[in-house]
Curated annotation (Swiss-Prot):
EC identifiers of the protein: 2.7.1.33
InterPro entries: ATPase_NBD, Type_III_PanK
Listed name of the protein: Type III pantothenate kinase
Enzyme class, broadest EC rank: transferase
Family note: Belongs to the type III pantothenate kinase family.
Note accompanying the cofactor annotation: A monovalent cation. Ammonium or potassium.
Native source species: Clostridium tetani (strain Massachusetts / E88)
Entry's localization field: Cytoplasm
Recorded metabolic or biological pathway in which this protein acts: Cofactor biosynthesis; coenzyme A biosynthesis; CoA from (R)-pantothenate: step 1/5
Cofactors demanded by this protein: NH4(+); K(+)
GO BP, sorted A to Z: coenzyme A biosynthetic process
Biological role: Catalyzes the phosphorylation of pantothenate (Pan), the first step in CoA biosynthesis.
One Gene Ontology MF term: pantothenate kinase activity
């Protein structure tokens, strides 16, 4: 079995693969102050609840956009899984060509998503990841990662309203039945859900046009991340939701690098 781990700014997502099959997935909160032993308590408990054994894990791969968490994660893997994890970063074999001005600036999660989508769909792509930030990535059919756009995430936008506007409350992210709302909570929810659908469609339309102007066929638009389903209901451009795109990308990258890391 292969353990894949993606550490984002808000959540850490873990997946366990047997061959190409995802047999378990879990989500933990990301906390840079948590020690390797504290993370291990949670991970061991998750394994036990799923009737899985740590010693059956043959390899581990990690991607992270939170540098301060890596010491604890690497030591947790070394101490409790007795493995040296593959870390997605410069020098990792991915199978895509990064055309960024400075490739080191590209978040590991964006690279991993691009690897998965390119491998699965074999088409020009626009990839949207609804995380702490909402990222948009453009990938050619041949596997060139061209770059993209970054917008504030839906949740942090909602939190900013709560923190900066004295009379606006913290609200649950859900779609009201109408965009013409008659109370503050529903009005904020309408702005977040209906508004983000418009943001997504406008950025995606621009990226698709630039890709096609460069000679690519019409791109497939793939969305992932915790809020992909909610926002896609108000988007006219999203073609596919792949909830485990990042985990799948980590599995693919592991297969490309496991012998190199031996």
């Amino acid at each position: 079995m292969i353990l894949v781990l993606d550490a984002g700014n808000t959540n850490m997502v873990l997946g366990l693969y047997e061959d190409k099959n995802l047999i378990a997935d879990w989500r933990l909160s990301t906390d840079p102050l948590r020690t390797a032993d504290e993370y291990s308590i949670q991970v061991i408990q998750l394994f036990l609840q799923s009737n899985l054994r740590l010693e059956d894990v043959e390899g581990v791969i990690v991607s992270s956009v939170v540098p301060n968490i890596m010491y604890s994660v690497e030591h947790m893997v070394a101490k409790y899984f007795k493995k040296k994890p593959i870390i997605v970063g410069p020098g990792t074999k991915t199978g895509i060509n990064i055309k960024y001005d400075n490739p080191k600036e590209v978040g590991a999660d964006r690279i991993v998503n691009a690897v998965a989508a390119h491998e699965i769909y074999k088409k020009p792509l626009v990839i949207i990841d609804f995380g702490t930030a909402t990222t948009f990535c453009a990938v050619t059919q041949s596997g060139d990662y061209l770059g993209g756009a970054i917008a504030p995430g839906v949740k942090i936008s909602s939190e900013a309203l709560f923190e900066k506007a004295a009379k606006l409350p913290r609200v649950e992210l859900m779609k009201p039945s109408s965009v013409i709302c008659k109370n503050t909570v529903s009005s904020m929810q309408a702005g977040m859900t209906y508004g983000y659908g418009g943001l997504v469609d406008h950025i995606v339309s621009k990226i698709k046009q630039e890709l096609m102007d460069s000679g690519e066929k019409e791109p497939l638009v793939v969305a992932t991340g915790g809020l992909a389903k909610l926002i896609s209901e108000e988007s006219e451009t999203i073609d596919i939701i792949h909830p485990f795109l990042t985990l799948e990308g980590l599995r693919i990258i592991y297969e490309k690098n496991k012998d190199l890391d031996a």
